[in-house]
């Protein structure tokens, strides 16, 4: 919870989770207290928290939805296609609807984006930690990227110490991964531009910036 509070104090409005949503069991002690903390929406209905919500941004209603992909993922995961359709059919309408699709398979991400092209404002892929270069606005107006990328250590393997990942990959032995806490940092993100009146998505642009430790 202290990490969540720190992010919110930095000016972050919404935090979306992914397949490791339950890695720290303590999250279930406070997840219902924060409307801005979204776990995947297509989990079993008994799991605490929510995965979609509307936020007011200077009078503009922005819905953010967090979903898990089914391809190569473990656990009980409901169909993400049905889940989005239910949101569109039964939930309150918003001016802008951004979907964070946390999944392994690029094909599944493309399929979901094309299936709801023009019905959601943006589908932003996450999970692989590596930013892709396929950002675009689809024919009917939905912004898309297969993976936004990560924020973390630049000289690492997906944010963890290189030596540990190499050992596990080489020998197959179990290894406890540790995050790199010092050195240059990588900041990955995207910027979405919307029309002020129609809320049509005009563009999506990636940010991929390496920041030296001395600049932090």
What residue spans do the PLM features occupy?
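Acidic, metal/ion-coordinating pockets
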Residues: 1-216
């Amino acid at each position: 919870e202290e990490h969540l509070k720190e992010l919110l104090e930095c000016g972050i409005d919404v935090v979306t989770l992914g397949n490791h949503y339950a890695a720290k069991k303590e999250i279930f002690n406070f997840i219902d207290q924060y409307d801005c903390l979204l776990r995947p929406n297509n989990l079993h209905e008994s799991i605490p928290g929510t995965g979609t919500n509307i936020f007011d941004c200077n009078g503009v209603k922005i819905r953010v939805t967090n979903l898990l992909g089914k391809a190569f993922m473990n656990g009980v995961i409901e169909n993400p296609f049905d889940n989005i359709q239910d949101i569109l059919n039964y939930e309150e309408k918003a001016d802008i609807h951004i979907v964070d699709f946390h999944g392994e398979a690029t094909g599944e991400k493309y399929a979901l984006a094309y299936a709801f092209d023009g019905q959601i404002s943006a589908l932003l892929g996450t999970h692989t930690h590596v930013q892709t270069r396929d950002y675009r606005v689809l024919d009917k107006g939905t912004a898309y990227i297969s993976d936004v990328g990560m924020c973390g250590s630049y000289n690492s393997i997906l944010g963890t110490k290189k030596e540990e990942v190499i050992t596990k990959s080489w020998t197959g032995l179990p290894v406890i991964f540790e995050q790199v806490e010092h050195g240059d940092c990588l900041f990955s993100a995207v910027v979405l531009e919307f029309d002020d009146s129609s809320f049509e998505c005009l563009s999506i642009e990636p940010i991929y910036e390496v920041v030296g430790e001395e600049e932090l």
